[in-house]
Curated annotation (Swiss-Prot):
This is Phosphatidylethanolamine N-methyltransferase. Residues 105-107, 215-221, 293-298, 415-421, 505-507, 582-987 are cytoplasmic. Its main location: endoplasmic reticulum. PROSITE patterns: SAM_CHO2 (PS51598). One of its GO terms (biological process) is phosphatidylcholine biosynthetic process. One of its GO terms (cellular component) is cortical endoplasmic reticulum. The chain crosses the membrane at residues 84-104, 108-128, 194-214, 222-242, 272-292, 299-319, 394-414, 422-442, 484-504, 508-528, 561-581. It comes from Botryotinia fuckeliana (strain B05.10). Residues 1-56, 327-348 are annotated as: Disordered. Residues 1-12, 19-28 have a biased composition (Polar residues). The keyword Lipid biosynthesis applies. It is a multi-pass membrane protein. It is found in: Endoplasmic reticulum membrane. It comes from the Eukaryota.
Length: 987
C-alpha cells in the first residue's frame, strides 16, 4: 500500500502544477468528462465527493470503495465471482494445513508463503514500477481493448468485457458507470482485485505457517509463557491498530497504490499513525509478525518474518519511494533573474542554436570575481560515506591508517583479561573525548567562537577552520565507534550451542538494534546533510527558521534513544558486564551532550521557533489518560529544575576547565610542531520480402560546430596533411555540438510497419550494415506513436506518417511514400565525443532499412585560436583576465545549456542566472558539464563543483583561476615557455 500521504505538505504544489498545465485545455477536458458540473455546484459537491484527475487532465468522480476484508468477509457487502475465487483459494490453504502430514507442513507452507511474498514484493513491485515509469499497465489495457465497448467492434473478447463490467459494477453500486469511467480508473480497479488475492493469500499462508511451527519450549514456566503470549498479543493488537488507522487516513486510494494510475484532487491528510513513524505500514506496521513469532515460540517463524520484513523494505526503497519523490516532491522552480533583459535570452538562444564566432567588447574595468556564498560553506568535497573517501586527503588517509592499526591489534592480540581491560579502557577514552572533549570545544565555539578565532589568528579563513573541525570530528567519531567495536569483539565469544536458552534470540535482537542505529544514522545524515551532521550552525550563520524533515518529523532528537540502539545491541550479543557499563556510559554522555551543548545553542539561535513536541510525542500524549499526562508534567518540571542546577554548577567550574583545556592545547601544539559482459539477443524479422531498402531514407539536422570542424588539421600532422583539403563535391562533413538536439527526418513506403523505429549508434559499434547487433540503450524513437508499451518510445516524435505523393525514384518510376520527423535530445543522445549514425529498423526488430550519413560530435577546445583577443588563460594582466574570463563565459554558456537539455527549468539564459534545483538532485547534469569542461579547457573538476558554483559566471571564474594555478604544470601548446629558462637567466 502506498504511503503517499506522508508527502501531503507538497500536494498543493502538485495541484498548482496540474491546474496550470491543464488550464489551456478546459474545453477538451469538459468534452472528455461528458458533463462537468457548473462552478457553484462543483464547489458544493466537492465537499461531499472526491474527484480524480487522470494524466491527460480528465476529471471524474471517485466512488466510495471498501477494504478487502470487508468485501470478502462482510455478508452485507455484495459478492461476485472474484470474491468466490479468493475465498476458495484461502479455503484450499486452510485445508492443506490439516491434510498434509506433520513432516511436510512446515516446508510446504514456508514455500507457499515465500511464493505469495514474492508475488507481493516482486510481482506487484514490477507492475507498479513499469506503471510509474511507462504507464505500462494502462498501455496493456489499451492494447488488448479490455474496456472497449463490443458495440464498436474493436473488442475481440466481448465475454471478458461483460465479466469485468459485472464484477466492477457489483462492487461499486453508486457513482460508478463502467462505460464512462476513465481507462486509468478501470485498470486500477482490475489491478486491486489481483492485489486482494495476493495480500489475502500472503497473510493467510503466513499465519498457517506460524500454526504449523507453533509450540512451547519444554522447560518454559507459566510466568514466561504468560509474558510471551501477552507481549505477542499486544504486538498483534498494535499492528491491527496501525493498519486500521493507516487505512482511515489514506483510504483505498493509497492503500492500493492509486496514485500510480491517477491523482485525487483534494487535500491529503497527515495525522494519526503517520505522525508516529516513517512509512508506518511498512515499519511499525509489521510488529504483528514478531508478535506472532513470539506466540509461536519458533525461530523459523521469526526468521521468515525478518525475511518478509526486509523484502517489504526493499519494495519501499525500489518501487514506492522513487514514485513518491517523482509525484509529490518535484524540484522547485529555478530562481530566474529579477529583471532578465530580452537581449540576455536572445543571446543565450542564439549561442545555443548556432555559433558562427565570438565577439568580445573591451571594457576598461576588470571583471569582478563573482561573490561566492560565505554564509555557509560550499558542499563540494564531502567527508561522509564510502563514495567520498579520497586518498589525497589527509583526514581520510589518517582514518584508514588508524582503522588498520585497530584491526591488526584486535586480530593479533589474545582475548585475555588484561587485553580485554585495555580495549575497554581505550573505548572509554575515545567515548569521553568524543562526547566531553568535542562537547567543550563546541560549547566554547558557540559562546566565544574559540575554534574559529584560533585559525583566524594565524591568517586562515573561516572555511579552513570549518574543514579542520570536520576532520577532527570525523576522526574522533570513527575512532570512538571503532574502539567500541574492537572492545565488543574482545569480550565476545562464539556460543558453543546456539539452541541453548536465549542465545539465538539475543543475537537476533542485537543485530536488529545495530541495524536500527545504522538506519537512524543514515536518516539523520539525509535530513541534516554534511553541514548539519558536523554542527555547521556553530560555525556559520544559521537559517532563519528550522525545517523538520525526514526522521526529525517524528523525533526531535533521534540520537537520544534509537540513535544509540546499536551499542545496546552489542550488550545483547556479548552478554558482557563491561560492555553494558560502556554502553551505559556512552548513552549517559550522549544525553549530557544533547542537554548541555546542543540544546542551549539551538535555543540561543532559534528561541521560540524550536518545536516543543515531535510527531511521536504528540501521538503518545493524545493516547494517555489525564492522570498520566499530569504526572508527566510534574516530571518535566523536576528535570528542568535539575538541569538548571547542573548548568549553574558547570558555569562555576567552567574557568578551571577552560584553563586546563588551554594548557592541553598548548602542550599538544608544541608536541605536534616537532613532529562486464552483457548478453544481447538480436531480433530479425522474417517478413522482409516486399520491402525495398531503397524506399527508406534517414537525414539529419543539428547545431553545427564549425570551430571543431576547422581544427581537424593541426601542426601534429605531416607536411602534406597540413594543406587544407580540397573537396571534389559539395559535401560538408557533419560535426555537431556536444549535447545539442538532433532532428531526424525519415521516409518510408506507405505500407511500412507501424512498429518501425530509429536508433542512434556509434559507427564503430556495428560491423554489419544490414542488422544491428547491439542494444540501443534507450537511444531510440518509434516512427509511429502509441505502438510500444514503453512511453519513452514516443518521446521525440514531431511528425509521423505524413503522406507525400509522386516521389520520383532513381529508376525513373514514381511512388507514394510517408515521411516523419523526430528529435533526439537529453538521455537519447550519447554524452561523449565520437562518430555516430542513425539506423532505421523494421517492425520492432533489428533489420536495418536505412542508415544516415555519419556525423561527429566534438567538443571544441578553447584556446587562443577560437578567441578574438590575443591573450592566454594564464595571463597576469587584469584587463586580459577580464577579457578572457568574458570569453570563457560566452563559450561556456551554450555548452552548459546543452548539458542541461536546454530545459527552461534548469538551463540558464545568461551567465549570471542560477542553475535549476534538479542539477543538484540528478548527478548526470554536473557530470556532463565537467566532461565538457575537461575537453574544452583541460581542467578536470568534480561534479560537486558545478553544483556549488551554481551559475556560469562562477564556473568560468573557477576555470580561469584553475588555469592560472596550473599554468606552470600545463603540457598544452602555448605561445611561450611554461617554466623559466634557467640557463637564459644566467646568461
Amino acid at each position: 500500500m502506498s504511503t503517499s500521504s506522508m508527502k501531503s505538505q507538497d500536494s498543493n504544489g502538485l495541484r498548482e502544477r496540474i491546474n496550470n498545465g491543464s488550464a489551456t485545455n478546459d474545453d477538451n477536458m469538459t468534452a472528455r468528462c461528458g458533463s462537468e458540473p457548473p462552478s457553484e455546484d462543483f464547489e458544493l459537491d466537492k465537499d461531499k465527493k472526491t474527484f480524480g484527475r487522470t494524466p491527460d487532465g480528465t476529471i471524474f468522480t471517485v466512488p466510495q470503495t471498501h477494504d478487502m476484508v470487508s468485501q470478502l468477509l462482510d455478508p452485507r457487502q455484495p459478492k461476485n465471482l472474484s470474491d468466490l475465487i479468493v475465498l476458495v483459494i484461502l479455503a484450499l490453504h486452510i485445508f492443506a494445513l490439516y491434510a498434509l502430514p506433520s513432516s511436510l507442513k512446515r516446508p510446504v507452507f514456508a514455500v507457499i508463503f515465500l511464493f505469495w511474498r514474492g508475488c507481493y514484493n516482486v510481482g506487484i513491485g514490477y507492475l507498479l514500477h513499469i506503471q510509474s515509469h511507462h504507464k505500462r499497465i494502462v498501455a496493456w489495457a489499451k492494447k488488448w481493448n479490455l474496456f472497449e465497448n463490443p458495440v464498436t467492434g474493436k473488442n475481440p473478447r466481448p465475454w471478458l468485457y461483460q465479466l469485468i463490467k459485472t464484477e466492477l459494477e457489483t462492487k461499486i453500486p453508486e457513482d460508478y458507470k463502467f462505460e464512462q469511467a476513465p481507462i486509468e480508473y478501470n485498470t486500477w480497479l482490475v489491478f486491486r482485485r489481483v492485489v486482494d488475492l495476493i495480500l489475502m493469500c500472503d497473510f493467510t499462508s503466513y499465519c498457517l505457517f506460524a500454526i504449523a511451527c507453533g509450540g512451547a519450549p519444554s522447560d518454559e514456566g507459566l510466568v514466561m509463557s504468560t509474558l510471551r503470549w501477552g507481549a505477542g498479543i499486544i504486538l498483534v493488537l498494535f499492528n491491527l491498530w496501525v493498519k486500521l488507522d493507516a487505512h482511515r487516513v489514506v483510504k483505498d486510494y493509497a492503500w492500493y497504490w492509486g496514485d500510480f494510475f491517477y491523482l485525487i484532487d483534494q487535500e491529503l491528510t497527515f495525522d494519526g499513525v503517520f505522525e508516529m513513524a516513517p512509512h508506518p505500514m511498512y515499519s511499525v506496521g509489521y510488529a504483528g509478525y514478531y508478535g506472532i513469532s513470539m506466540m509461536a515460540a519458533s525461530y523459523s517463524v521469526l526468521a521468515i518474518s525478518i525475511v518478509a520484513h526486509m523484502a517489504q523494505f526493499a519494495f519501499l526503497l525500489v518501487v514506492e519511494n522513487p514514485h513518491i519523490d517523482k509525484t509529490y516532491n518535484p524540484p522547485p522552480p529555478r530562481k530566474h533573474q529579477d529583471n532578465p533583459t530580452p537581449s540576455d535570452i536572445d543571446h543565450a538562444n542564439a549561442l545555443a542554436s548556432s555559433k558562427e564566432g565570438l565577439e568580445y567588447s573591451l571594457d576598461s574595468s576588470p571583471t569582478q570575481t563573482p561573490p561566492l556564498n560565505t554564509t555557509q560553506p560550499l558542499a563540494v568535497h564531502n567527508l561522509m560515506g564510502l563514495g567520498n573517501i579520497d586518498l589525497f586527503r589527509i583526514t581520510d588517509v589518517s582514518i584508514l591508517l588508524l582503522l588498520g592499526y585497530v584491526f591488526l591489534i584486535t586480530a593479533l592480540t589474545p582475548s585475555t583479561p588484561v587485553y580485554q581491560a585495555l580495549f575497554v579502557i581505550n573505548a572509554m577514552f575515545w567515548r569521553l573525548w568524543y562526547s566531553v572533549g568535542l562537547g567543550i570545544i563546541l560549547d566554547r565555539q558557540s559562546s566565544k567562537k574559540m575554534w574559529t578565532r584560533h585559525f583566524v589568528k594565524y591568517g586562515d579563513s573561516t572555511e579552513e577552520a570549518w574543514r579542520q573541525w570536520k576532520g577532527m570530528y570525523h576522526l574522533s567519531m570513527t575512532m570512538c565507534y571503532a574502539s567500541f567495536i574492537a572492545a565488543t569483539w574482545k569480550m565476545y565469544s562464539i556460543p558453543s550451542d546456539w539452541a541453548y536458552g536465549l542465545v539465538l534470540l539475543r543475537h537476533v535482537l542485537g543485530a536488529g538494534l545495530v541495524s536500527l542505529q545504522l538506519w537512524t544514522a543514515i536518516s539523520i545524515y539525509e535530513s541534516l546533510g554534511e553541514f548539519g551532521w558536523f554542527f555547521g550552525d556553530f560555525f556559520f550563520d544559521h537559517a532563519p527558521k528550522l525545517t523538520y524533515s525526514g526522521i526529525y518529523r517524528y523525533l526531535n532528537n533521534p540520537e537520544r534513544i534509537i540513535g544509540l540502539a546499536g551499542i545496546w545491541g552489542a550488550v545483547f550479543i556479548t552478554g558482557s558486564r563491561a560492555i553494558f557499563c560502556l554502553a551505559l556510559l556512552s548513552h549517559t554522555l550522549t544525553l549530557a551532550f544533547l542537554q548541555f551543548v546542543e540544546k542551549p545553542h539551538m535555543q540561543k539561535l532559534y528561541g521560540r521557533n524550536l518545536r516543543s513536541e515531535a510527531g511521536l510525542s504528540k501521538s503518545i500524549k493524545r493516547s494517555l489518560p489525564p492522570q498520566i499526562k499530569k504526572w508527566h508534567g510534574n516530571v518535566d518540571r523536576v528535570l528542568e529544575e535539575t538541569g538548571h542546577f547542573v548548568e549553574e554548577f558547570l558555569d562555576a567550574a567552567r574557568p578551571k576547565l577552560a584553563a586546563g583545556v588551554s594548557t592541553i592545547f598548548r602542550d599538544t601544539s608544541a608536541l605536534f610542531s616537532q613532529y562486464p559482459a552483457r548478453l544481447t539477443l538480436t531480433r530479425i524479422a522474417p517478413d522482409l520480402a516486399g520491402y525495398d531498402p531503397r524506399d527508406y531514407s534517414v537525414t539529419i539536422e543539428g547545431t553545427s560546430s564549425d570551430s571543431a570542424l576547422h581544427k581537424r588539421t593541426t601542426s601534429k600532422e605531416g607536411i602534406t596533411a597540413r594543406i587544407p583539403q580540397e573537396r571534389m563535391d559539395g559535401f560538408k562533413p557533419l560535426v555537431f555540438e556536444y549535447g545539442a538536439p538532433i532532428k531526424v527526418k525519415w521516409t518510408a513506403p506507405t505500407k511500412h510497419s507501424k512498429a518501425d523505429w530509429i536508433g542512434m549508434y556509434m559507427v564503430a559499434d556495428n560491423a554489419s550494415r544490414e542488422v544491428t547487433r547491439i542494444p540501443s540503450a534507450g537511444r531510440w524513437v518509434a516512427t509511429v506513436p502509441n505502438e510500444y508499451e514503453s512511453s519513452p518510445a514516443d518521446q521525440g516524435i514531431l511528425v509521423s506518417n505524413r503522406f507525400v505523393s509522386g516521389s520520383k525514384r532513381i529508376d525513373g518510376s514514381t511512388q507514394d511514400y510517408v515521411e516523419g520527423e523526430m528529435i533526439f535530445e537529453g538521455d537519447k543522445l550519447f554524452w561523449t565525443q565520437g562518430v555516430f549514425e542513425f539506423r532505421y529498423h523494421h517492425d520492432g526488430k533489428h533489420n536495418v532499412m536505412a542508415i544516415s550519413l555519419p556525423f561527429e560530435i566534438r567538443i571544441p577546445r578553447f584556446d587562443d585560436e577560437n578567441s578574438n583577443v590575443n591573450i592566454t588563460l594564464d595571463s597576469d594582466n587584469s584587463q586580459s583576465q577580464s577579457l578572457i574570463r568574458s570569453a570563457v563565459e560566452q563559450a561556456l554558456l551554450p555548452v552548459v545549456r546543452n548539458c542541461f537539455d536546454r530545459d527552461p527549468d534548469i538551463a540558464p539564459n545568461s551567465v549570471d542566472e542560477s542553475f535549476g534545483v534538479l542539477v543538484a538532485r540528478d548527478g548526470k547534469y554536473p557530470r556532463r558539464v565537467v566532461h565538457a569542461v575537461h575537453f574544452m579547457f583541460g581542467i578536470e573538476f568534480a561534479p560537486e563543483v558545478v553544483r556549488a558554483d551554481g551559475n556560469v559566471r562562477n564556473l568560468a571564474w573557477r576555470i580561469c583561476n584553475a588555469k592560472q594555478v596550473l599554468a606552470p604544470y600545463s603540457m598544452s601548446h602555448s605561445k611561450g615557455t611554461n617554466t623559466p629558462d634557467v640557463d637564459g637567466e644566467k646568461a
